[in-house]
């Protein structure tokens, strides 16, 4: 093979590798965005279940839950309050609530991005995998991280109903996130259709 043909073959191989790397990076970005969208849907579903269960919970359990929460607030609101105190900022009640809701969604979206990128490497399939993801997230966030960061009380201070409600709501979050990712992955790829 002549030197010029060898150089052309090398250049073609480099172009193919670059194109493959670009497709892989694009695929990763698309999957991360899909994870963010699915996570937002998951948080929305979690909220519906959590609020329903909260509204039907024993009033004594609700009172105990509020009493042990830092400042009587759920973790996202407690984080916003802590940020206000650290920066000397005073938000209006409406701004505090809006920012707290954004933080709450961010707390649910961030792990969903990771889940979307890694879910094919995780045990289980379909909604069972989503349920395991949601239950695992409940254990990590609600039972461990909220306590360690001071955004929640020690788990034993909450009534059993709070743990049950959290587990059910987060399991629904995981299933909803998985279903949304499945739906997104089955959507027609318009850019692929226009390139063919």
Which positions does each model-derived feature cover?
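Short amphipathic, positively biased membrane-proximal segments
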Residues: 1-196
């Amino acid at each position: 093979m002549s030197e010029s043909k060898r150089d052309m073959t090398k250049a073609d191989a480099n172009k193919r590798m670059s194109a493959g790397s670009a497709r892989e990076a694009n695929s990763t970005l698309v999957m991360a965005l899909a994870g963010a969208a699915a996570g937002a849907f998951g948080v929305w579903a979690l909220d519906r279940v959590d609020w329903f269960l909260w509204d039907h919970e024993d009033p004594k359990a609700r009172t105990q839950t509020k009493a042990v929460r830092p400042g009587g607030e759920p973790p996202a609101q407690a984080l916003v309050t802590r940020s206000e105190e650290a920066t000397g900022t005073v938000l209006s009640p409406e701004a505090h609530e809006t920012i707290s809701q954004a933080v709450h969604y961010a707390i649910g979206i961030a792990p969903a991005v990771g889940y979307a990128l890694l879910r094919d490497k995780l045990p289980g399939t379909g909604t069972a995998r989503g349920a395991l993801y949601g239950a695992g997230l409940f254990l990590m966030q609600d039972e461990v991280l909220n306590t360690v960061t001071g955004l929640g009380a020690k788990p034993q201070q909450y009534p059993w109903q709070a743990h049950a409600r959290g587990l059910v709501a987060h399991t629904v979050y995981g299933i909803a996130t998985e279903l949304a990712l499945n739906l997104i992955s089955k959507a027609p790829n318009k850019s692929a259709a226009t390139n063919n």
